[in-house]
């Protein structure tokens, strides 16, 4: 029994290596086949295997993703030689599910996701980066955007606060404070 095991595995290797019998069910060979056909990107068994002109083996889904994420610089992930969809050759052999070109079936594009905007508290009208800064150009008292400002067109400011809210009270206080400061400056200009 001990001598029968090694000779059986040797005959299986001989028939799979050069014989026309085709497939074998030996577990020793599947381990060797897995190590022979490894993708150079995911380092797993190559599914829908393609080989580049420089001789490197890849899964087509892995290589497709590699090429899609680098559209301006399409190089081989291993040796940095030029590579594209047309410069790879599909491999057909044992273990392949069909004789269809793997380059014809591209992986589906993932759905886009739009996150909800963040709600920022406090005064949103101050600062240059948040859209609170507004500028209009004009000559003298006639700004070019007079109609846009008169009819509130393309205005990025938030709506006024509802009377009775703490924001409304704060805005009224600031308005009165700035009016008082303006009156003091005008009075100082008159007496100076």
Curated annotation (Swiss-Prot):
Q: Name the encoding gene, please.
A: Rnf185
The molecular function terms in GO held by this entry are: protein-containing complex binding; ubiquitin binding; ubiquitin protein ligase activity; ubiquitin-like protein conjugating enzyme binding; zinc ion binding
Q: In which pathway does it act?
A: Protein modification; protein ubiquitination
- Entry's transmembrane regions: 131-151, 172-192
The protein's job, in short, is: E3 ubiquitin-protein ligase that regulates selective mitochondrial autophagy by mediating 'Lys-63'-linked polyubiquitination of BNIP1. Acts in the endoplasmic reticulum (ER)-associated degradation (ERAD) pathway, which targets misfolded proteins that accumulate in the endoplasmic reticulum (ER) for ubiquitination and subsequent proteasome-mediated degradation. Protects cells from ER stress-induced apoptosis. Responsible for the cotranslational ubiquitination and degradation of CFTR in the ERAD pathway.
Segments of skewed composition (Polar residues): 1-14
Q: Write out the ranges of the annotated region (Disordered).
A: 1-30, 90-123
Per the record, what are the reactions this protein catalyses?
Answer: S-ubiquitinyl-[E2 ubiquitin-conjugating enzyme]-L-cysteine + [acceptor protein]-L-lysine = [E2 ubiquitin-conjugating enzyme]-L-cysteine + N(6)-ubiquitinyl-[acceptor protein]-L-lysine
Q: Can you say what this protein is called?
A: E3 ubiquitin-protein ligase RNF185
Which UniProt keyword terms apply here?
Answer: Autophagy, Endoplasmic reticulum, Immunity, Innate immunity, Membrane, Metal-binding, Mitochondrion, Mitochondrion outer membrane, Transferase, Transmembrane, Transmembrane helix, Ubl conjugation pathway, Zinc, Zinc-finger
Query: Domain comment?
Result: The RING-type zinc finger domain is responsible for E3 ubiquitin ligase activity.
Q: Specify where it is mainly localized.
A: mitochondrion
UniProt cross-references to Pfam families, sorted A to Z: zf-C3HC4
- The answer to whether UniProt assigns keyword Translocase to this entry is no
């Amino acid at each position: 029994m001990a001598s029968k095991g090694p000779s059986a595995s040797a005959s299986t290797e001989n028939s799979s290596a050069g014989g026309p019998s085709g497939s074998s069910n030996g577990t020793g060979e599947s381990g060797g086949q897995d190590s022979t056909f490894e993708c150079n990107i995911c380092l797993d068994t190559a599914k829908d295997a393609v080989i580049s002109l420089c001789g490197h083996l890849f899964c087509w889904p892995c290589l497709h993703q590699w090429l899609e994420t680098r559209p301006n610089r399409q190089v081989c992930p291993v040796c940095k030689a030029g590579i594209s969809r047309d410069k790879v050759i599909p491999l057909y052999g044992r273990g392949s599910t069909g004789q269809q070109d793997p380059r014809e079936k591209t992986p589906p594009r993932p759905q886009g996701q739009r996150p909800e905007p963040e709600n920022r508290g406090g005064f949103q009208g101050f600062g240059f980066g948040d859209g609170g800064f507004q500028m209009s150009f004009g000559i003298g008292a006639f700004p070019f955007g007079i109609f846009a400002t008169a009819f509130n067109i393309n205005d990025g400011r938030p709506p006024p606060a509802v009377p009775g809210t703490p924001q409304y009270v704060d805005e009224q206080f600031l308005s009165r404070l700035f009016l008082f400061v303006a009156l003091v400056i005008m009075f100082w200009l008159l007496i100076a």
